[in-house]
Amino acid sequence: MLSPLALALSSNAAHADFRVCNATQSLVGVAIGYRAKSGWVTEGWWHVDPSTCKTLIEGALSSRYYYLYAEDAERGGRWDGPVNMCIAEKEFKISGVQDCFARGFQRAGFQEYDTGEQASWMVQLTDEPTTAGGNAGNATGTQ
């Protein structure tokens, strides 16, 4: 299992967003889940090249909790967690997290990130081994 690290952002960040940085040497596909006004939503795939970052949500964060799932497109590893949500093989935006298979989707375990009252958040995906109990995740935000 691969490890996500969440890094703190300085309080003078230029803009608010939710970003994922890929600190590996492989292409990574990323999916995000969150609660919208209409209910649960999952979206993917963002392709994040090695040693780059990609913004998944632009602007100030409107939810406190966000959920990430990512796959190493070249070596087959993944960054996952205990929260089951729906995904699809191709680009997707799925409403709801129940009955994934019955609705023609796949199910994956997402890692939860509590962004608190932060306006910005960044997760860094690394090759580092995970600690007991799951993936390590460091997240920071700015107000």
Report the location of each language-model feature.
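Bacterial N-terminal signal peptides
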Residues: 1-8
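Intrinsically disordered, low-complexity segments enriched in small/polar residues
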Residues: 12-21, 25-29, 35-55, 59, ...
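Short, Lys/Arg- and Gly-enriched loop/turn segments at beta-strand edges
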Residues: 62-68
